[in-house]
């Protein structure tokens, strides 16, 4: 009697032909900028018992968990879709694992990778000082309820990057005296002479890089 065929079903995200772009970005951020230095990149390889091939990128996270993005080629040859690409995004913890959406994967990544505003930036913004940090992964905040501090720092960063408009100049004139007093009181702060904000491009997020739901 012929053995019954069994299927293993996992959720995947069908994408256009962007896995090479994804791999290039991962290698650039891992070896060039060191933003993803802790990530483990497993190149495109053949799975022995399957017809499809895959690659893996493993991102170690906090508390012993990790996020894994698997890229698949040739998932449905019986239909002639030999160029079909897809990814699976899985979060592994100590006690369980689950598949997650690209939006939640961005939140998990930002908890460990790519710097964000530090706690002292609100005080620096109020005193009119230069911000010493910035958020390199703004898309990770898109599907969260942002705090008022984060929204304010985003506005301040954007305004200063675009140059001082008339409204901003008027604000500076009206508050010059109070800012001068605040700066005098905080003259002993060693952080004022710190380094400028971390340079580098913002990470666009998994969905945008891979073209998920494009």
UniProtKB/Swiss-Prot annotation:
The modification Phosphoserine is found at residue 147. The keyword Membrane applies. It is a peripheral membrane protein. GO terms for biological process: viral life cycle. The modification Phosphothreonine is found at residue 98. The keyword Ubl conjugation applies. GO terms for cellular component: host cell cytoplasm; host cell plasma membrane; membrane; virion component. It is found in: Host cytoplasm; Host cell membrane; Virion. This is Virion infectivity factor. Processed in virion by the viral protease. Highly phosphorylated on serine and threonine residues. Counteracts the innate antiviral activity of APOBEC3G. Forms a complex with host APOBEC3G thus preventing the entry of this lethally hypermutating enzyme into progeny virions. Functions as an adapter molecule, recruiting APOBEC3G to the ubiquitin-proteasome machinery. Targets APOBEC3G for degradation through the assembly with elongin BC complex, CUL5 and RBX1. Binds viral RNA and affects the stability of viral nucleoprotein core. May play a role in viral morphology. A motif (HCCH motif) lies at residues 110-141. InterPro entries: Vif. The BC-like-box motif mediates the interaction with elongin BC complex. The HCCH motif (H-x(5)-C-x(18)-C-x(5)-H) mediates the interaction with CUL5. Vif-defective viruses show catastrophic failure in reverse transcription due to APOBEC-induced mutations that initiate a DNA base repair pathway and compromise the structural integrity of the ssDNA. In the absence of Vif, the virion is morphologically abnormal. Keywords: Host cell membrane, Host cytoplasm, Host membrane, Host-virus interaction, Membrane, Phosphoprotein, Ubl conjugation, Ubl conjugation pathway, Virion. Homomultimer; in vitro and presumably in vivo. Interacts with viral Pr55Gag precursor and host APOBEC3G. The interaction between Vif and APOBEC3G is species-specific, which may play a role in restricting the replication of SIV to their host. Forms an E3 ligase complex by interacting with host CUL5 and elongin BC complex (ELOB and ELOC). Residues 180-203 are annotated as: Disordered. Residues 154-166 are annotated as: Multimerization. Induction: Expressed late during infection in a Rev-dependent manner. Belongs to the primate lentivirus group Vif protein family. A motif (BC-box-like motif) lies at residues 147-156.
